[in-house]
Amino acid sequence: MSVEYGPNHDFLCACNTYHRKPNIKITAVVFGTTKERLVCSECLTFIIENLEIQNGQLCIQEVKRFWQAGKFAWEKQSEL
């Protein structure tokens, strides 16, 4: 996993902003491809609040609205 750091050694979060530590590493399966990303506690809270079970799998709803396009390529109903 590559992490982009800012000038103050903060990290680029999935929400496309820089945050200082602590950070949380999450792993997601996106259309069969495993992706890892560092997220801040606000992003993690959003993920947890938007988890749903569909077809026996945990999915995130409305993620495309939250993350900037191209920063973390989750589409609506991505698998975790």
Swiss-Prot record:
Protein name (record): Uncharacterized protein ORF3
Taxonomic source organism: His1 virus (isolate Australia/Victoria) (His1V)
